Amino acid sequence: LTTGGIRGGKKQMGEYYPRSFNMGITKKVFQKTGGYRIPFMGEDLEFSIRIITAGFKTVLIPNAFVYHKRRTNLMQFYRQINYFGRARINLTRFHPGHLKILHLFPLIFIVGFISVLVLSLLNQNLGFLGLKCYVIYLSLITAEALLKLRSLKAALYTPLTTLIQMSGYAVGFIH
């Protein structure tokens, strides 16, 4: 119910673009593409775009295990997501056709949320209706997390982490 599906999971919402933390390539792919070209945010996704453009196929191996460091606090998570938002803009400069409407969802979410808060000050009824929509959305995310994770503690964190995810990406995107 958030934007996680666009990053690449078992259920693809489009072409699979591997990230460097779980990417394996052949020598032929490296030689034809030249490997990483740019030392900036989103370099792995930029490389994946060039791999696919060069005619190579990318696949997700669902049974492969990848261990990587998770962010250990919410501020680190915010910084990482903010970085992803800024990376999306950098990628769009190199590959304009790869900005999708779904990439705008966090920005729309946060602009809408701020608008609802302002609207609440101007018209309580309309503001309440808007806030109700956000509460329903966050409740659905919490319920989905509870069903998937089977952990009440983790599920109760999802509204907060969703707001951090959306705001971090949106701020990075417009930065």
Identify the residue ranges that each predicted region occupies.
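Short glycine- and hydrophobic/aromatic-rich loop-to-beta-strand nucleating segment
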Residues: 15-28, 45, 109
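Membrane-interface anchor segments at the N-terminal boundary of transmembrane helices
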Residues: 97-108
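Membrane-embedded multi-pass helical conduit in multi-pass membrane proteins
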Residues: 109-175
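Short loop segments at secondary-structure junctions
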Residues: 27-28, 55, 115
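Generic alpha-helical secondary structure signal
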Residues: 20, 25, 76, 80-83, ...
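Short, flexible, basic/aromatic active-site loop/helix in glycosyltransferases
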Residues: 1-17, 21, 31, 94
